Curated annotation (Swiss-Prot):
This is Synaptotagmin 2. Binds 3 Ca(2+) ions per C2 domain. Ca(2+) 1 binds at residues 114, 120, 172, 174. GO terms for molecular function: calcium ion sensor activity; calcium-dependent phospholipid binding; metal ion binding; SNARE binding. Ca(2+) 5 binds at residues 247, 307, 309, 315. Expressed throughout the intestine and in several neurons in the head and tail. Keywords: Calcium, Cytoplasmic vesicle, Exocytosis, Metal-binding, Repeat.
Length: 369
């Protein structure tokens, strides 16, 4: 049985100020664009698009654009600093297991995305055109020269490698809004000699803007709070934005379902109310899950968004999985594991936006409403 009702969120002001920021800035046909702060570096004013703390919700055009006055400066090693930075990675292929290994070694000379002149970079790694397997490095805070040394494996038959392209996209992590792309690199695998381990360092290119090609599903904002004394986790679904259009009229009737899992075992499930004809629903509905202290690091929560259909089965839009990084579940992003970790150390609600993801192929199933 679905649990019904919603518990009023508290404290309300703190959460609303995060998920529902006051829009201040320049009005445009698409809404409001923030007024970026400027830093004078002697050759002109460079806009610094900061989102910590956030006062507006960023648009797709709000990317950091480094200024090049025609003379690229030198790094400490004497190498030219590229305007989007550089990335160092390693590629090798295991012919016996048909596995492609990609090691993200480091990045350097990345653009500064935060007010303090630093960034919180991480790298997404995937292979085109399928995008079935996506990996992320850990987030390294307050640096423009992160070192990762993290390896990811893709199952690809050797005779298919020539038709694949390796994509590396560097992001700046932001807890209170959508993460910003800093730079990207596409590597056609047909150009790689897989007879040896290939060590590559290349400049990053200008990142592509989010568009229909990226099949964005939308974003969701929720808060989490853990009370060890009572063994309860309170999850408050605040709102969602820019959801995928599921209905003929170009809208959706979204609602949110929350599943509590221990491994593959379903322990509890709850859902929000439905919101009709909107791609930006507001909920502010809270749910409590009873979790014993010895189980808190063994369970995970799946927050999924669905489109309600009266005449047919409901359609899945997207989901995020929240849990400890020690579970080693590939669907738990670094943003989700960081929110979980902060929830475990803070006694206040932890609020964060997340980008909705596709379900992994083996986990796809129909709605059971």
């Amino acid at each position: 049985m679905w649990a019904t009702g919603a518990i009023v969120c508290s404290p309300v002001f703190r959460i609303l100020s995060t998920c529902c920021p006051i829009r201040r800035g320049v009005p445009t046909s698409n809404g409001y664009h923030p007024r970026p702060k400027h830093v004078d570096i002697g050759n002109g004013a460079v806009p610094i698009l900061s989102s910590k703390p956030i006062t507006v919700q960023p648009t797709n055009s709000d990317y950091y654009e480094p200024v090049n006055n025609g003379t690229l400066p030198l790094s400490s090693s004497g190498a030219l600093i590229k305007q989007y930075g550089n990335i160092h990675f390693r590629v090798e292929y295991d012919f016996e297991q048909s596995k492609l290994s990609v090691t993200i070694v480091s990045a350097s000379d990345l653009p500064a995305m935060d007010r303090n002149g630093m960034s919180d970079p991480y790298v997404k790694v995937y292979v085109l055109p399928e995008r079935k397997q996506k990996f992320e490095t850990r987030i390294i805070r307050n640096t423009l020269n992160p070192t990762y040394n993290e390896t990811f494996q893709f199952s690809i038959p050797f005779n298919e490698l020539h038709s694949k392209t390796l994509m590396l996209v560097v992001y700046d992590y932001d807890r209170l809004s959508k993460d910003d792309k800093m730079g990207q690199l596409s590597v056609p695998l047909e150009s790689i000699d897989f007879g040896i381990t290939t060590d590559i360092e290349r400049p990053l290119q200008k990142p592509e803007k989010d568009d229909e090609k990226e099949c964005r599903l939308g974003d969701i904002c929720f808060s989490t709070r853990y009370r060890p004394a009572t063994g309860t986790v309170t999850l408050t679904i605040m709102e969602a934005r820019n959801l995928k259009k599921m209905d003929v009229g170009g809208s959706s009737d979204p609602y949110v379902k929350i599943y509590l899992h221990h491994g593959r075992k379903l322990l509890s499930k709850k859902k929000t109310s439905r919101k009709y004809k909107t791609l930006n629903p507001y909920y502010n509905e809270s749910f409590q899950f009873k979790i014993e202290p010895h189980m808190i690091e063994k369970v995970h929560l799946i927050v999924s968004v669905w489109d309600y259909d009266k005449m047919s089965k409901n359609d899945f839009i997207g989901e995020v999985t929240l849990g400890s990084k020690h579970l080693n579940l590939p669907q738990i992003t670094h943003a989700c594991s960081e929110q979980w970790a902060e929830m475990m150390t803070s006694r206040r609600p932890v609020v964060q936006w997340h980008t909705l993801q596709e379900r992994m192929e083996k986990e796809k199933k129909k709605d059971d409403d």
